Amino acid sequence: MSDNQICDISNEVLEELKKFRFSKSKNNAALILKVDREKQTVVLDEFIDDISVDELQDTLPGHQPRYVIYTYKMVHDDQRISYPMCFIFYTPRDSQIELQMMYACTKSALQREVDLTRVYEIRELDELTEEWLKAKLK
Protein backbone atom coordinates (compact mmCIF):
# COMPACT_ATOMS: atom_id res chain seq x y z
CA MET A 1 0.00 0.00 0.00
CA SER A 2 1.39 3.43 -0.91
CA ASP A 3 1.54 6.36 1.50
CA ASN A 4 -1.43 8.18 -0.03
CA GLN A 5 -3.63 5.12 -0.43
CA ILE A 6 -5.84 3.93 2.40
CA CYS A 7 -6.97 0.56 1.02
CA ASP A 8 -5.11 -2.29 -0.64
CA ILE A 9 -6.43 -3.83 -3.85
CA SER A 10 -7.08 -7.54 -3.42
CA ASN A 11 -5.40 -10.09 -5.69
CA GLU A 12 -8.87 -11.28 -6.71
CA VAL A 13 -9.69 -7.78 -7.97
CA LEU A 14 -6.40 -7.56 -9.87
CA GLU A 15 -7.14 -10.90 -11.58
CA GLU A 16 -10.73 -9.90 -12.37
CA LEU A 17 -9.55 -6.58 -13.81
CA LYS A 18 -7.15 -8.40 -16.11
CA LYS A 19 -9.84 -10.85 -17.27
CA PHE A 20 -12.36 -8.04 -17.75
CA ARG A 21 -9.98 -5.89 -19.82
CA PHE A 22 -9.19 -8.75 -22.19
CA SER A 23 -12.72 -10.13 -22.42
CA LYS A 24 -14.16 -10.54 -25.91
CA SER A 25 -17.75 -9.93 -24.79
CA LYS A 26 -20.06 -8.29 -27.31
CA ASN A 27 -22.36 -6.97 -24.57
CA ASN A 28 -22.34 -4.19 -22.04
CA ALA A 29 -20.65 -5.50 -18.91
CA ALA A 30 -19.88 -4.16 -15.45
CA LEU A 31 -17.25 -5.04 -12.89
CA ILE A 32 -18.42 -3.50 -9.61
CA LEU A 33 -15.89 -3.08 -6.82
CA LYS A 34 -16.32 -2.02 -3.22
CA VAL A 35 -14.20 -1.36 -0.15
CA ASP A 36 -14.22 -3.95 2.63
CA ARG A 37 -14.09 -1.51 5.50
CA GLU A 38 -12.74 -3.96 8.10
CA LYS A 39 -9.95 -5.30 5.91
CA GLN A 40 -9.35 -1.92 4.24
CA THR A 41 -9.21 -3.67 0.90
CA VAL A 42 -10.89 -3.16 -2.47
CA VAL A 43 -12.85 -6.34 -3.24
CA LEU A 44 -15.12 -7.62 -5.99
CA ASP A 45 -18.75 -6.78 -5.35
CA GLU A 46 -20.24 -8.15 -8.54
CA PHE A 47 -19.55 -8.94 -12.20
CA ILE A 48 -22.54 -8.57 -14.50
CA ASP A 49 -22.51 -9.41 -18.19
CA ASP A 50 -25.15 -8.01 -20.55
CA ILE A 51 -26.28 -5.12 -18.33
CA SER A 52 -27.80 -1.90 -19.61
CA VAL A 53 -26.97 1.47 -18.08
CA ASP A 54 -30.46 1.55 -16.50
CA GLU A 55 -29.95 -1.90 -14.99
CA LEU A 56 -26.56 -0.80 -13.69
CA GLN A 57 -28.20 2.19 -12.05
CA ASP A 58 -30.71 -0.15 -10.36
CA THR A 59 -27.91 -2.47 -9.21
CA LEU A 60 -25.81 0.14 -7.42
CA PRO A 61 -26.65 0.83 -3.76
CA GLY A 62 -28.27 4.18 -3.01
CA HIS A 63 -26.08 5.21 -0.08
CA GLN A 64 -22.74 3.42 -0.50
CA PRO A 65 -19.89 4.32 -2.87
CA ARG A 66 -18.71 1.93 -5.57
CA TYR A 67 -16.12 1.73 -8.30
CA VAL A 68 -17.49 0.53 -11.64
CA ILE A 69 -15.52 -0.57 -14.67
CA TYR A 70 -18.04 -0.58 -17.50
CA THR A 71 -17.81 -1.75 -21.11
CA TYR A 72 -20.44 -0.19 -23.31
CA LYS A 73 -21.53 -1.36 -26.77
CA MET A 74 -21.61 1.92 -28.68
CA VAL A 75 -23.18 2.17 -32.13
CA HIS A 76 -21.78 5.21 -33.94
CA ASP A 77 -23.64 7.40 -36.44
CA ASP A 78 -21.95 5.55 -39.32
CA GLN A 79 -23.11 2.21 -37.78
CA ARG A 80 -19.63 1.21 -36.62
CA ILE A 81 -19.64 -0.57 -33.27
CA SER A 82 -17.06 0.02 -30.58
CA TYR A 83 -16.76 -1.15 -26.99
CA PRO A 84 -15.31 1.71 -24.95
CA MET A 85 -14.38 0.88 -21.37
CA CYS A 86 -14.67 3.45 -18.62
CA PHE A 87 -14.04 3.82 -14.92
CA ILE A 88 -16.95 5.30 -12.95
CA PHE A 89 -16.43 6.46 -9.39
CA TYR A 90 -19.80 6.59 -7.67
CA THR A 91 -19.85 8.34 -4.31
CA PRO A 92 -23.29 9.38 -3.02
CA ARG A 93 -23.44 12.70 -1.18
CA ASP A 94 -25.22 11.12 1.76
CA SER A 95 -22.84 8.19 2.31
CA GLN A 96 -20.81 8.11 5.51
CA ILE A 97 -17.87 10.54 5.52
CA GLU A 98 -15.42 7.81 6.61
CA LEU A 99 -16.49 5.64 3.68
CA GLN A 100 -16.24 8.56 1.23
CA MET A 101 -12.68 9.20 2.43
CA MET A 102 -11.68 5.54 2.06
CA TYR A 103 -12.98 5.45 -1.51
CA ALA A 104 -11.58 8.85 -2.50
CA CYS A 105 -8.11 8.10 -1.14
CA THR A 106 -7.97 4.75 -2.93
CA LYS A 107 -9.39 5.95 -6.25
CA SER A 108 -6.05 7.03 -7.78
CA ALA A 109 -4.33 3.73 -7.02
CA LEU A 110 -7.24 1.80 -8.53
CA GLN A 111 -7.23 4.08 -11.58
CA ARG A 112 -3.55 3.28 -12.11
CA GLU A 113 -4.32 -0.46 -11.95
CA VAL A 114 -7.26 -0.15 -14.32
CA ASP A 115 -5.24 2.09 -16.67
CA LEU A 116 -8.23 3.71 -18.38
CA THR A 117 -8.41 7.24 -19.74
CA ARG A 118 -12.18 7.50 -19.54
CA VAL A 119 -12.72 8.28 -15.85
CA TYR A 120 -16.00 9.74 -14.60
CA GLU A 121 -17.45 10.59 -11.23
CA ILE A 122 -21.09 10.68 -10.24
CA ARG A 123 -22.62 11.74 -6.95
CA GLU A 124 -26.24 10.69 -7.55
CA LEU A 125 -27.55 7.52 -9.19
CA ASP A 126 -29.97 9.43 -11.40
CA GLU A 127 -26.95 11.03 -13.13
CA LEU A 128 -26.05 7.59 -14.53
CA THR A 129 -28.07 7.40 -17.73
CA GLU A 130 -27.39 6.14 -21.22
CA GLU A 131 -27.58 9.72 -22.56
CA TRP A 132 -25.00 10.87 -19.99
CA LEU A 133 -22.66 8.00 -20.86
CA LYS A 134 -22.98 8.53 -24.63
CA ALA A 135 -22.22 12.23 -24.19
CA LYS A 136 -19.13 11.42 -22.12
CA LEU A 137 -17.86 8.83 -24.59
CA LYS A 138 -18.12 11.09 -27.67
Swiss-Prot record:
Gene3D superfamilies linked: Severin (3.40.20.10)
GO molecular function, one term: Arp2/3 complex binding
Signal peptide: none
Disruption phenotype: RNAi-mediated knockdown results in not severe delays of border cell migrations in stage 10 egg chambers. Simultaneous RNAi-mediated knockdown of GMF and flr results in an accumulation of F-actin in follicular epithelium of developing egg chambers, border cell migration delays, and in deformation of bristles in the thorax. Simultaneous RNAi-mediated knockdown in border cells of GMF and flr enhances the accumulation of F-actin foci.
GO BP: actin filament debranching; border follicle cell migration; negative regulation of Arp2/3 complex-mediated actin nucleation; regulation of actin filament polymerization; regulation of cell projection organization
Tissue spec. comment: In ovaries, expressed in follicular epithelium, in polar cells, migrating border cells, and centripedal cells (at protein level).
One Pfam family of this chain: Cofilin_ADF
Domain ADF-H: 3-138
Sorted UniProt keywords: Actin-binding, Cell projection, Cytoplasm, Nucleus
InterPro entries in the cross-refs: ADF-H, ADF-H/Gelsolin-like_dom_sf, GMF
Keyword Zinc carried by entry: no
Subcellular location field: Cell projection, Lamellipodium; Cytoplasm, Perinuclear region; Nucleus; Cytoplasm, Cell cortex
Keyword Iron appears in the UniProt entry: no
Main location: other
GO cellular component: cell periphery; cortical actin cytoskeleton; lamellipodium; nucleus; perinuclear region of cytoplasm
Highest taxon, organism lineage: Eukaryota
Recorded family membership: Belongs to the actin-binding proteins ADF family. GMF subfamily.
Chain's role: Inhibits Arp2/3-mediated actin nucleation. Together with flr, promotes Arp2/3-nucleated actin filament array disassembly. Promotes debranching. Regulates lamellipodial protrusion dynamics possibly by facilitating lamellipodial retraction. In egg chambers, enhances the retraction dynamics of cellular extensions in border cells and thus together with flr plays an important role in directional migration of border cell clusters.
Name the record gives this protein: Glia maturation factor
Organism of origin: Drosophila melanogaster (Fruit fly)
Chain's gene name: GMF
